[in-house]
Amino acid sequence: MINISLSDGSVRQFEKGMTIYEVANAISMSLAKQAIVAEINGELKDLSTVIENNCKLRILTAKDPECLEIIRHDAAHLTAEAVKELFPETQVTIGPAIENGYYYDFARDKPFTVDDLAVIEAKMQELAKKNEKVTRELWNRDKAIEFFRSIGEHYKAEIIASIPTDEPITLYRQGNFIDLCRGPHAPSTGFVKYFKLMKVAGSYWRGDSRNQVLQRIYGTAWATKEQLDHYLFMLEEAEKRDHRKLGRELDLFHFQEEAQGMVFWHDKGWSIYNIVEQYIRKKIRKNGYTEVKTPVLVDKRLWEASGHWEKFRDNMFALEADNKILALKPMNCPCHVQIFKQGIKSYRDLPLRMSEFGLCHRNEASGALHGLMRVRSLVQDDAHIFCAEEQITDETVSFCKLLTEVYKDFGFTDIKVKFSDRPEIRAGSDEVWDKAENALKEAVEKAGFTYTLNPGEGAFYGPKLEFVLTDAIGRQWQCGTLQMDFVLLEQLDASYVAASGEKKRPVMLHRAILGSLERFIGILIEEYAGCFPLWLAPVQVAIATITSDLNDYALAVQKALIDNGVRTDINISPDKINYKIREFSNHKVPLIAIIGKKEKENKQVTIRRLGTTDQQVLSVKQLITLISEENSKYL
């Protein structure tokens, strides 16, 4: 007999040599029916696994989050099985689970079409309903290679040949389909119930553009119908909110081939950009930051001294002038250190908070570019805090407070913090890392945040905090960072005079709240679905006349608004008022000021707010006051 410790804390005895499924069935027949995989001593296993020794056992069902990846991997195999039945000449390659779904890469001469996807999905439903048994088989390496070659699956044969000789070769069989896989998998195809094929894209064998072009089918799979429906709804919402689409529709910005990854800001988009910058500038000034400006083009000698040339060279744009190699800066920190080094710094000067809206350039691969979210030319709301070790906690608490205020003003209240601690390869002593990590942890807790730990994910030069926002449709965006740095000031020989009179190295805190302005504006466009709050809207008030004889009054109202800093648009054309209202509403202007004869007589306007038919009559002065008061809260 063997002792099995179960997840409820009980310990039960079973015959040695029973499978996990048999144990589950002995506990409860309903549990055995629902079981997908199990965890033995922390390792996921198939239900067919034989238990030979005492162990800790967790039997997992669709309710357990660990099973979602299993279901998605099962769905990938089901996709491959369906493709092989429908298109037997197609070769299968790999099909992993990924975030929110899975993909499977196929080699075939003819691309899959949208119609093909519908047929494949229908076949998958059919195979799932058959509830085919899934079995794990251990194969001899040479036999497996020979088998896959014999059935024309040369990619699978190549994968097996590349597996280290000390690793077992395991295949999974379901119906007439067999695939190479480490597993584990559910006991039958019937556990894959709620899925959808999403799209087809091109890929390369082993991710190398020199290799064969493959056809990648993306799918999504979930444990329940509700989860699937929610995900599809979220995708639909995300498509409606896509900042690239709204950027065109609202005339905010565009991109073109002649300047890949560089934004062409239109007047309305640039207005938003400047408002965001103005807002951040006001916040940091109130929090004791100085603002500086450093060169965009810097001799490579500085990048060599800082270590960036060695580690970041491939992502830097460089050029030659006057027999020197110059590089467009990819980040601001080495330049900020140069300002810190001008003149003697004393402990009385610390903490020194140095900010810059620094224009940076990064040579991102063209395939990685994605609207405002991933660009080659970007401006960061970057700052570096030079402080003494004993000031780290207070500075971090202060930063967390500022960051929370900023996010709240933009409508983000769900903030998660990730703490990345020391990696295996790192600079500095364990004692220094202990101090740094403890200071950050203490600060985060003082600021009222809980955090999740990313073990070993800190940079080699210091631990890091990452701040993650959740948007209106549940997506998460990592924006803010606070990174401690023990190395750069050593490399660039920056110091201050301590109270004792000796020279000491300050600690450097790299920090950003928005990240890049471009990306954050992209997030804002999607968060608000283009309907910006009044203080942030590129056009705050649009004036629409009912008849042409009111144009002079409308122009006078516009001038009064502009003179008081209100961003306005106007339509005094002969078009009907309903058309004007519809056009301004389509451009998501928060306030529409309607002017008719009565409004002119009373020196008033009738205000209609975006998204409602309710109307409010205001004097021009009242309208200016309303907007000015709203602006003053933020700007």
From Swiss-Prot:
Amino acids binding Zn(2+): C333, H384, H510
InterPro entries: aa-tRNA-synt_IIb, aa-tRNA-synth_II, aa-tRNA-synth_II/BPL/LPL, Anticodon-bd, Anticodon-bd_dom_sf, Beta-grasp_dom_sf, TGS, TGS-like
Single Gene Ontology MF annotation: metal ion binding
Disulfide bonds: none
Keyword Phosphoprotein: no
Keywords from the UniProt entry: Aminoacyl-tRNA synthetase, ATP-binding, Cytoplasm, Ligase, Metal-binding, Nucleotide-binding, Protein biosynthesis, RNA-binding, tRNA-binding, Zinc
EC number: 6.1.1.3
Protein name (database record): Threonine--tRNA ligase
Source species of the chain: Rickettsia canadensis (strain McKiel)
Name of encoding gene: thrS
